[in-house]
């Protein structure tokens, strides 16, 4: 009798995706982040569901309801902090996952890569709206500043902002709709993640060498299931260390002050995972220019397959490109630091230089380095 997992219509899908899937024999731990992102997403949906049971999306009670969750609900504090810090772990995994894709040339799987970029945008939108929900000072002013950026769009900008706000400022209507969107988006992300996997399984995984691994495949289970379990344990360990020892490490103290439209905090800044993009936005003195640079800083990922000039797919055997890749990582860390600093000398000029460097590296230096490497190998 044939095994049920190979015949049952539903089990067959699971089997072909997670059990009998032919996987390259040499994929490293950098390939763990896909499954870790799946775990993060499930964790966020579960903790978010339990938070939504006690949260009220009204300006008068939102802040109090979060306090109530932390003080009065059974283990409410741990659910709240797992959700808040879970978002940080989610973005750490996301950045590692995208970085892996850039380093090893995974962007050559066009459909998978483009769905991935859409997933990144959707996750950023979800995280932004989630940050507004506790209705603290940084929630309110963050929402005001970021939504206001849309007013830079010529002709329709102002109308668009007021339409999103549901009034003439960030208020009840804004909070309610942000809660609705924050609830629905993770399920859209889950559906997109399935499409992401569907496209990936059309081609099979890439591997560190960037060379076809069709000649040397191993079954996903037990080899990579056990590897993913180890990754998951380390992820949960890191998350719980954060939650149980320093739950507010990555948060902003201003968010423990209830939202007050009459009092602007001295330094308005988003969560740490948006700081690099925020620094790029602030480094351009023009409003529309800043917004365009902000969007392009992420949208530039879509251009990666077009900017690939090397005859090799991966950077594994390309030392000049490797060097530039790590300079790009250092540049992004610099931008993250600058995004959290006040707008004054010397931070302004450092931010502007780091922003120029970011686009210069991706658009000019890395493709040039690839061409030089081709010539060095007489290709």
UniProtKB/Swiss-Prot annotation:
Tagged with keyword Repressor: no
Highest taxon, organism lineage: Eukaryota
Binding-site list for heme b b562: 83, 182
Binding site for a ubiquinone: 201
InterPro entries referenced in this protein's UniProt entry, alphabetically: Cyt_b/b6_C, Cyt_b/b6_C_sf, Cyt_b/b6_N, Cytb/b6-like_sf, Cytochrome_b, Cytochrome_b_C_euk/bac, Cytochrome_b_N_euk/bac, Di-haem_cyt_TM
Cofactor: heme b
Membrane topology: Multi-pass membrane protein
Gene Ontology process terms (BP): mitochondrial electron transport, ubiquinol to cytochrome c
GO molecular function annotation: metal ion binding; ubiquinol-cytochrome-c reductase activity
Cellular compartments per GO CC: mitochondrial inner membrane; respiratory chain complex III
Keyword annotations from UniProtKB, A to Z: Electron transport, Heme, Iron, Membrane, Metal-binding, Mitochondrion, Mitochondrion inner membrane, Respiratory chain, Transmembrane, Transmembrane helix, Transport, Ubiquinone
Short name of one Pfam family: Cytochrome_B
UniProt-annotated location(s): Mitochondrion inner membrane
Main location: mitochondrion
Annotated binding of heme b b566, by residue: 97, 196
Co-factor note (free text): Binds 2 heme b groups non-covalently.
Note: Heme 1 (or BL or b562) is low-potential and absorbs at about 562 nm, and heme 2 (or BH or b566) is high-potential and absorbs at about 566 nm.
Family: Belongs to the cytochrome b family.
Protein function: Component of the ubiquinol-cytochrome c reductase complex (complex III or cytochrome b-c1 complex) that is part of the mitochondrial respiratory chain. The b-c1 complex mediates electron transfer from ubiquinol to cytochrome c. Contributes to the generation of a proton gradient across the mitochondrial membrane that is then used for ATP synthesis.
Quaternary structure, from the entry: The cytochrome bc1 complex contains 11 subunits: 3 respiratory subunits (MT-CYB, CYC1 and UQCRFS1), 2 core proteins (UQCRC1 and UQCRC2) and 6 low-molecular weight proteins (UQCRH/QCR6, UQCRB/QCR7, UQCRQ/QCR8, UQCR10/QCR9, UQCR11/QCR10 and a cleavage product of UQCRFS1). This cytochrome bc1 complex then forms a dimer.
Protein name in the entry: Cytochrome b
The organism of origin for this protein: Redunca fulvorufula (Mountain reedbuck)
Record gene name: MT-CYB
């Amino acid at each position: 009798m044939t095994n049920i997992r190979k015949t049952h219509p539903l089990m067959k899908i699971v089997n072909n995706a997670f059990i009998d899937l032919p996987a390259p024999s040499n994929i490293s731990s950098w390939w763990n982040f896909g499954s870790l992102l799946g775990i993060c997403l499930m964790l966020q949906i579960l903790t978010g569901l339990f938070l939504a049971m006690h949260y009220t999306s009204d300006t008068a009670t939102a802040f109090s309801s979060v306090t109530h969750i932390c003080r009065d609900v059974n283990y409410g504090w741990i659910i709240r902090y797992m959700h808040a810090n879970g978002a940080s772990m989610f973005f750490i995994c996301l950045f590692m996952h995208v970085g892996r894709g850039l380093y090893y040339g995974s962007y050559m799987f066009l459909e998978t890569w483009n769905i991935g970029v859409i997933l990144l945008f959707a996750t950023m939108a979800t995280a932004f709206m989630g940050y507004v929900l506790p209705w603290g000072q940084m929630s309110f002013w963050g929402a005001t500043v970021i939504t206001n950026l849309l007013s830079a769009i010529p002709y329709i900008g102002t109308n668009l902002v007021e339409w999103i706000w549901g009034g003439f400022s960030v208020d009840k209507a804004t909070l309610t709709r942000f809660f609705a969107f924050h609830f629905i988006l993770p399920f859209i992300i889950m559906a997109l993640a399935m499409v992401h996997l569907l496209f990936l399984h059309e081609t099979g995984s890439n591997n560190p060498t960037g060379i076809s691994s069709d000649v040397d495949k191993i079954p996903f289970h037990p080899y990579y299931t056990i590897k993913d379990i180890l990754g998951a344990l380390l992820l949960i360990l890191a998350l719980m260390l954060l939650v149980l020892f320093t739950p507010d490490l990555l948060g902003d103290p201003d968010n423990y002050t209830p939202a007050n439209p009459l009092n602007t905090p001295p330094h308005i800044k988003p969560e740490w995972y948006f700081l690099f993009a925020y620094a790029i936005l602030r480094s351009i003195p023009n409003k529309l220019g800043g917004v365009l640079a902000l969007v392009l800083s992420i949208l530039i990922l879509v251009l990666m397959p077009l900017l690939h000039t090397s005859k090799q797919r991966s950077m594994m055997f390309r030392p000049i490109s490797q060097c530039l890749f790590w300079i790009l990582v250092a540049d992004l860390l610099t931008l993250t630091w600058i995004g959290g600093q006040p707008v004054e000398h010397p931070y302004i000029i450092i931010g502007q230089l780091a922003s120029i460097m970011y686009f210069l590296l991706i658009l000019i230096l890395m493709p040039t380095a690839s061409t030089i490497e081709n010539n060095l190998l007489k290709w």
